[in-house]
């Protein structure tokens, strides 16, 4: 699978315009709705521009691969977190790409450390959790906590899991362009 490396915000906008209306992995929202909800939640909590950008772009990897929308239902882990981080690394700093790269591990971490977190996951998120390795071992927990941006990844993960409501209205993508621009390398 070839990976698209983006070099500008206009390329990111183009990808959202071309693929953003695709299904968001078995949820009742599209990819763009999920991204906008995540970023809106981050903004509502006064997150930094970099973390708002990470919230907007955390699932960008789903938009740049050629797998079907239902890949997780077919037992396929698309490693979207790594794809997104790699695709965006030439235009954004680690403060954007590292929380993106860690947000899947953050779900595993939260399901291991918070007894109630697993019960908050949607069916689709439980399916992907199993593909992504399930809960963490003690060694994996300690390794996760050693990453510089692990706490940002946890915040991002919570917004990610809340951003699946088809009734929520958010600002348009254009609202978040200033956050993206201020986060550029």
Mark where each language-model region is.
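Metal-dependent phosphohydrolase cores
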Residues: 1-185
């Amino acid at each position: 699978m070839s990976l698209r490396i983006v070099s500008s915000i206009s390329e990111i906008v183009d990808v959202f315009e071309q693929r953003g209306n695709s299904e968001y992995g078995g949820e009742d929202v599209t990819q763009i709705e999920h991204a906008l909800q995540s970023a809106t939640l981050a903004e509502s909590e006064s997150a930094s521009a970099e973390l708002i950008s990470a919230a907007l772009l955390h699932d960008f990897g789903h938009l740049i691969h050629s797998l079907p929308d239902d890949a997780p239902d077919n037992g396929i882990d698309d490693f979207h977190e790594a794809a997104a981080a790699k695709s965006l690394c030439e235009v954004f700093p680690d403060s954007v790409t590292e929380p993106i790269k860690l947000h899947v591990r953050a779900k595993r971490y939260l399901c291991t450390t918070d007894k109630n977190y697993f019960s908050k996951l949607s069916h689709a998120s439980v399916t992907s959790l199993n593909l992504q390795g399930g809960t963490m071992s003690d060694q994996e927990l300690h390794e996760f906590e050693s990453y510089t941006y692990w706490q940002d990844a946890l915040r991002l993960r919570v917004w990610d899991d809340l951003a699946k409501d088809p009734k929520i209205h958010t600002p348009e993508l254009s609202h978040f362009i200033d956050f993206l621009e201020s986060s550029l390398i």
